[in-house]
Every structure is written in C-alpha cells, then in structure tokens.
C-alpha cells in the first residue's frame, strides 16, 4: 500500500497514497472514506477514472462531474446485497449505499466479475443501461500456486502451528465478517467428526463485536471437539500456498461471494471446494 501523501512510481505506474483528513479522525467510517474520495477527486489528472467498490466510487463520480473524466467501475460486491454492513457502519451504510447507487447509474462502463454479478447489478440498479455492464472474470496467476518443493520454507507453517499433516484437514481462509460466514461455520463444525482437523486462517474482523462472537464460538468448539487451529495472522504467500497444498478440502461458507479469489486459489492448488 502507498503511504498517505507519498507518490511513488514503477515504470509508467504512479501510486499515490491518501490518508483520512485529521478533521474526520473520529468520524463514521463512511465519512472517513468520503474524506479520502474528495482529496482524490480534487487531484485527478487522468484520461479515465477506474473505481473499485463503493470506497472509491464517490471519487470517480466526482471526478467525472468536475473534470469530465470518463468513469469505469469494477463491481466486486454491492451494498444492497450486504445488509450486515450496517452492523459495521451504522448510519454510514446509508451513505455507502447512496454513493454506490449514484456512481453506478452515472458510470460510463461497469465491469462485473462474474455473470451472476452482472445480473445482481442490473437487479439492484434498474436505471443502469444493460449495454454498459460487461463481464470480466476475476483471475489468478496459476504459477503462483504450484506445488512447493519438499524443502520449501513455506512448509514451516505446519510445525509453527502444530498442524498434523497425517490427519484429514479442512481449511478456511477469509476475513471475520458476516459475509464470509465464519460464525455459521463454527456452529456447523460441531456436526462433523472429531477426527477431522480444521484450520482457520481468519483475521481482520469487521467489528469488535463479531471478533468477540467468533472468539467465544471458537473457544466452545475447541473445548467440545478439539482438533482445530486458528491462525489470526496474515500468512505470507509461500506459507499459505503450502497450507493449501497440505490440506484435503477448502471450506467456503460465504453467504455472498460474487467470485471469490480464495476459491480460485484453492482450486489452483488442487483442493476440492
């Protein structure tokens, strides 16, 4: 990530980081985002503005109105299909929904990451011209998920977290959020055989409340069945790759997933999902 206020270049690519204005340090998260968007829109000097999700939609839409910059949006999720975000944003959910709707309805092109996502976009925003909505699927670089060599340092993750490679193992990778379904998975795991080892790579909780909910559910599950490992840190790619190659199946309990990258990565490692 770029450091706020810092401009760096790699070849012809210039990356500029923005921070939340100090006046909004204690504001609702949606207002903090808008504060960043206003700075971006003010600085835009480009032929095309390309925004991803509502976090940058307002910046792109303002740039279009201010400077006549064509706006392209890539849709990875939609606010109307994520009502649980109100738990995180409070009234800010009304703001994020408003910003997304206005930006989508005035965009010059909207990219959906799957066919299902395109259908959702048109259902959520019927005023949007269908001819402006195209599908460009998410993808991954397959070579990044090749089977690690026996001496690959990534395998160290098994020893560090005491994961038994001789046991049948299920793997979950995702943020701690309603959308990713971890609270529901923890309830369901009471129903499977205690002989099955479960590894949860889960962090970055949406709210302190859901963090505590997951912590309590994990403790109860660990006491009742054991054989479960929780990795809260974000693993480096070599270790996550080794973990995916060393487990037997990948669990995706998401209740909303337009096209999950983690599922593609797991399949690239040969894991059933």
Regions found by a protein language model. Give the residues of each.
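N-terminal strand-loop element at the rim of the active site
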Residues: 1-30
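Nucleotide-sugar donor phosphate/pyrophosphate-binding loop at the beta->alpha transition
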Residues: 69-72, 80-102, 119
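Carbohydrate-associated surface elements
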Residues: 116, 139
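A short helix/loop element that forms part of the nucleotide-sugar donor recognition site in Leloir-type
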Residues: 146-163
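Nucleotide-activated donor-binding/catalytic signature segment of Leloir-type glycosyltransferases, i.e.
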Residues: 167, 200-202, 211-234, 238
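A conserved mid-protein helix/loop that constitutes part of the nucleotide-sugar donor-binding site
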Residues: 168-172, 177-191, 212
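Short alpha-helical donor nucleotide-sugar binding micro-motif in glycosyltransferases
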Residues: 241-247
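Aromatic "clamp/platform" in nucleotide-sugar-dependent glycosyltransferases that forms part
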Residues: 255
């Amino acid at each position: 990530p770029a450091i706020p206020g810092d401009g760096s270049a790699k070849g012809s690519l210039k990356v500029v980081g923005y921070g939340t204005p100090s006046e909004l340090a204690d504001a609702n998260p949606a207002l903090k985002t808008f504060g960043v968007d206003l700075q971006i829109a003010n600085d835009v000097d480009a032929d095309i503005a390309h925004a991803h999700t509502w976090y940058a939609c307002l910046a792109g839409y303002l740039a279009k109105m201010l400077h006549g910059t064509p706006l392209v949006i890539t849709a990875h999720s939609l606010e109307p299909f994520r009502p649980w975000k109100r738990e995180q944003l409070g009234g800010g959910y009304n703001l994020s929904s408003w910003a997304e709707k206005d930006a989508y309805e005035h965009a010059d092109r909207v990219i959906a990451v799957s066919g299902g996502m395109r259908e959702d976009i048109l259902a959520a925003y019927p005023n949007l011209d269908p001819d402006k909505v195209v599908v460009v699927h998410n993808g991954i670089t397959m070579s990044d998920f090749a089977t690690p060599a026996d001496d690959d340092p990534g395998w160290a993750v098994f020893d560090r977290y005491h994961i038994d490679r001789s046991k049948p193992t299920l793997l979950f990778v995702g943020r701690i959020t309603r959308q990713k379904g971890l609270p529901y998975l923890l309830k369901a795991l009471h129903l499977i055989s205690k002989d099955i080892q479960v590894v949860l790579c889960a962090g970055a909780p949406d709210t302190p409340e859901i963090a505590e909910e997951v912590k309590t559910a994990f403790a109860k599950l660990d006491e009742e069945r054991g054989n479960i490992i929780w990795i809260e840190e974000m693993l480096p790619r070599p270790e996550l790759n080794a973990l995916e190659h060393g487990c037997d199946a990948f669990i995706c309990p998401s209740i909303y997933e337009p096209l999950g990258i983690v599922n593609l990565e797991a399949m690239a490692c040969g894991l059933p999902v």
